[in-house]
């Protein structure tokens, strides 16, 4: 819509979180952007932003995480700034959606379904503006669902709700990144060919099934270590270099709830 050539870079978990020098170098191996816009990261990457600027491009950071002492020297959009914005608990995609609204007005509302899914998946409080985003996004999903959503919904469902987003759709989308293929989730959202959408949906469903098996395996290993070593008072500390970083958070949450 703005006459620009846009490319999307999705980092893999193995490359670290947020804006990293390795990610920047990888981007510049393929092309030389004039502008880099971050989504859901960057507010804590002042040094990396400087590295980007030294590489010859401008930077806009859009993020929702807590503000560090050292803010990047660039345009930063974050609801945590004390600048009068009335709601500070948006998720990263919620911030991106608000940027789209600022640029495109009501025509950006067609992306409310994506913003709703991300809001639920990121476990931010379903209050205030988040509640509105999810409610309106669900209306879109239930009246004119995109293929990337409808392939995950059963024919017998009366309609999708927040529970559907959290436990039916989000795990399959997240599984792509956990299995080292985050680009497949992006491809699913941007693909228009019906056959390709179906194949990508099937791939993500398969990833999620594999992810569940891997998590169960890691959980059993962690339980064995816990039985052997015990806890430190009310603290459980377990570690194994073979454990996949994409699964440890899920297993840790499971153990925390159990104990």
Regions found by a protein language model. Name each.
Residues 1-35, 55-56, 104-259:
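Hydrophobic helix-and-loop "lid/oligomerization" segment in the mid-to-C-terminal part
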Residues 10-14, 66, 95:
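A short, conserved beta-to-alpha structural element at the edge of catalytic cores
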Residues 20, 38-90:
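Histidine/acidic-residue-rich, glycine-tolerant segments that coordinate divalent metal ions
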Residues 46, 71, 90-93, 97, ...:
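Amphipathic alpha-helical transducer elements in NTP-driven molecular machines
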Residues 70-121:
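Short alpha-helices
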């Amino acid at each position: 819509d703005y006459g620009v050539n846009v490319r999307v870079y999705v980092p893999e978990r193995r490359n670290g979180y947020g804006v990293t020098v390795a990610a920047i170098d990888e981007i510049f191996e393929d092309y030389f952007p004039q502008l880099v816009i971050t989504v859901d990261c960057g507010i804590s990457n002042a040094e990396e932003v400087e590295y980007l600027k030294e590489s010859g491009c401008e930077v806009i950071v859009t993020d929702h995480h807590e503000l560090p002492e050292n803010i990047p020297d660039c345009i930063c959009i974050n609801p945590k700034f004390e600048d009068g914005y009335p709601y500070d608990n948006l998720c990263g995609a919620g911030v991106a959606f608000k940027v789209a609204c600022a640029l495109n007005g009501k025509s950006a509302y067609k992306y409310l379904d994506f913003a709703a899914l991300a809001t639920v998946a990121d476990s931010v409080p379903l209050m205030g503006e988040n509640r509105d985003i999810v409610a309106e996004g669900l209306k879109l999903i239930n009246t004119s669902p995109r293929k990337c959503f409808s392939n995950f919904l059963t024919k017998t469902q009366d309609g999708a709700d927040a529970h559907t987003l959290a436990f039916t759709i989000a795990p399959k989308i997240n599984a792509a990144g956990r299995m080292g293929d985050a680009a497949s989730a992006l491809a699913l959202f941007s693909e228009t060919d019906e056959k390709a959408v179906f194949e990508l949906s099937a791939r993500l469903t398969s990833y999620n099934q594999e992810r569940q098996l891997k998590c169960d395996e890691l959980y059993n290993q962690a339980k064995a270590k816990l039985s052997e070593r015990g806890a430190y008072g009310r603290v459980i500390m377990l570690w194994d270099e073979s454990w996949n970083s994409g699964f440890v958070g899920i297993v840790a949450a499971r153990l925390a709830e159990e104990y």
